[in-house]
Amino acid sequence: MNDLTILVTASGSPGTAALLRALRVNGERRVRLVGTDMAELAVGRHLCDAFHVVPPGSDPGFADALISICEREGVDVVLPQSTYDLPGLAAAQERFPCVVLVSSVDAVRRSNDKAETYALLDAIGAPGPRWHRARGRDAVAAAARELGYPGEEVTVKPLESSGSRGFRILSASADPLDQLLTNRPGVAPALRLEELVALLPETGGPELLVMELARGKERTIDGIARGGRIVLGHPKTREAMRVGLAMYFETLEDPWLMDVAQAIVRELELDHFFNIQLVGDKVIEVNPRISTVVYQDDLNLPYLGIKLALGELSEEALAAHASRIRPTRRALRYFEQVEWDV
């Protein structure tokens, strides 16, 4: 079997070390890893065979920078990790000299724009939070009150964001002093509505998504899709949050969650890796990219997804791996470090 060169973007992100290890220790072939990141201090510099600093994913020159690296490094596959990398890669994927594991421009846009995502959920009858999009202090205040504020807590976030960036809970009982004294580092404080609107212009400004606060256990469905069909995937929990990151995961067996995911994947016509996040029974986010993986010795999702994209594995052969998914599987994320001299 031929050696592979895989380029992994955002190689300073939290899941990078485990992902690179899974790609390298695949049991079949030698893999050469090329990491890219917008930051010099990315762990990919130390864990990959080659490393390049690139512009941010939102930069117009991002895709051209990656194309140049792919040509110089002889890359076979590009595996993006960051939401912000997807639009540029999707728009330019036909110009790459290799396979890029990204969905279509339309699928990426509809997934990344949370208002588009929630409109899609409403249209197909998938469970999602009640929501409004609003711009300016009066519109945001009216949207919050329509969702039950001050009697109910509501949430706000930008239309396009990644992870918990920009996410805030609006609570009439928010106590700034108590939060100052008791919140752990990295926990964003709740705001009163009047505190938020004081930050907003009367008209214009950023467009926000104002939503009901979903409550309950966090779960995701992670998998590999082709042409809007889930070929292989499974649900898992997201637990033990620290600085905005889940640190503990349990693989689940839940047909209802898989049905919800299939409806969304079909409507978006997703390809390659995807991650769909729920809080309680409400879908809150669709990520058309790889996310945290619960690895098994006999089930290497990242490597299998690459083999499917390269045509080395049929959909039927990939789907047969579903029998290996173990609901007993657990994963605990922890902090590690590397050292070097300059």
Residue ranges and their predicted role:
Residues 1-104:
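ATP-binding N-terminal substructure of ATP-dependent carboxylate-amine bond-forming enzymes
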Residues 3-7, 153, 209:
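Residues that mark the start of a beta-strand
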